[in-house]
Structure formats: C-alpha cells, structure tokens
C-alpha cells in the first residue's frame, strides 16, 4: 500500500531582485541559500529558485505545518538563519507568497507578524510522495 504525505505545505514566493542585483548575483546567492536550507532544515522537502521573466519564483516544500513554522522561526531574529535571511532580503523584494495545502490556524497566525502578502489555498485533493 502506498503511503503519501497528505500534510505537505508548499510556498510559491514571487519576488523581484533589488536594484543593482545582477542575474549572476541572483544565481550565486540562490545556490548558497538553497544549500543552507538543505543543511539546516531536514523537514524541508524541497527548495528551488526559478527564473520567470523579470521575476524570481521560489518554491518551498515542507513536510507539514510544523516544518513551515520551524523555517519561519529559523530566519527570525536571534535564530540560526537570521544572518542568511538578512542577506536574502538584500537580494529580493517580495511580491506575494501563495501557500498551498491545508495550513493550520497556527501557521497562519505565526506568519502574520512578518507583514508579507500571504495568500492561503486549501487543497481539494492532492498527494505527495515526499
């Protein structure tokens, strides 16, 4: 019998690069930040930066709400990825963040203080193999 993860949460983050940030700088930083997440967040299932015309799309896949909240904690002030996230914000501005999956009220409440444009989309049907 197949076992699927029905709790996966996916963030699709639409961003612009900040003025003075070249395509090469985006590429180099994206590799650095992706490696940083891979090394520090075992319950982050996937992470990737993608070119989309003049925008950058970041797709973040989390095992569940707990993993998504842990990531948000990790990038917060005084936490393990605070300095790396500060560099992130030197490169990118957020346009919007679409969150796919059945996000808990806890996750929704946790991200509110970030003051970013979050849009939550519950699933009708889905599966994730991990």
Residue ranges, per PLM feature:
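Short S/T/G/P-rich N-terminal loop/turn motif that feeds into the first structured element of a domain
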Residues: 1-56, 63-73, 90-130
């Amino acid at each position: 019998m197949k076992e699927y993860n029905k709790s996966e949460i996916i963030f699709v983050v639409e961003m612009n690069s900040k003025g003075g940030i070249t395509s090469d700088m985006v590429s180099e930083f994206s590799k650095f930040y992706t490696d940083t997440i891979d090394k520090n967040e075992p319950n982050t299932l996937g992470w990737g930066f993608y070119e989309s015309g003049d925008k950058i799309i970041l797709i973040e896949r989390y095992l569940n709400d707990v993993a998504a909240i842990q990531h948000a904690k990790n990038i917060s002030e005084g936490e393990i990825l605070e300095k790396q996230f500060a560099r992130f914000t030197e490169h990118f501005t957020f346009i919007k963040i679409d969150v796919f999956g059945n996000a808990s009220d806890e996750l929704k409440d946790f991200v509110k203080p970030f003051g970013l444009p979050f849009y939550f989309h519950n699933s009708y049907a889905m599966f994730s193999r991990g």
